[in-house]
């Protein structure tokens, strides 16, 4: 049985690239959603850091997304628009 995998990325847009970076994140999120790979939520912290929360459908879909040419193009573009602060590839839920 597959379960969603939570990933979190914290990033800041490079100077002068905020609008293009957010547009690229939106494009990437759309590609991943249309491919059935994941669903995303984007948050902005008051000091300018962005937090991208991604729920991968499964480990298999995450691997498949890494091979998707449309997604690869967006990830490559983002590399020139943002600086990654922190990435959590897989977070496990702890029951409370």
What residues fall within each predicted segment?
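Glycine-rich beta-strand-turn "strand-cap" elements at beta-sheet edges
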Residues: 1-6, 11-12, 38-51, 74-96
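Short, surface-exposed ligand-recognition loops at beta-strand->loop->(often short) alpha-helix junctions
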Residues: 11-23
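Short coil/turn motifs at secondary-structure junctions
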Residues: 14-16, 45, 57-59
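An amphipathic, aromatic/His-enriched active-site/gating alpha helix that lines ligand/cofactor pockets
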Residues: 27-39, 55-89
């Amino acid at each position: 049985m597959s379960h969603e995998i939570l990933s979190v990325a914290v990033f800041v847009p490079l100077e002068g690239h905020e609008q293009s970076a957010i547009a690229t994140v939106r494009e990437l999120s759309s590609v991943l959603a249309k491919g059935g790979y994941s669903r995303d939520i984007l948050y902005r912290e008051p000091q300018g850091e962005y937090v991208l929360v991604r729920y991968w459908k499964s480990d298999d879909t995450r691997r498949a997304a890494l091979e998707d040419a449309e997604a690869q193009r967006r990830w490559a573009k983002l590399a020139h628009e943002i600086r990654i602060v922190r990435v959590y590839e897989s977070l496990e839920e702890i029951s409370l």
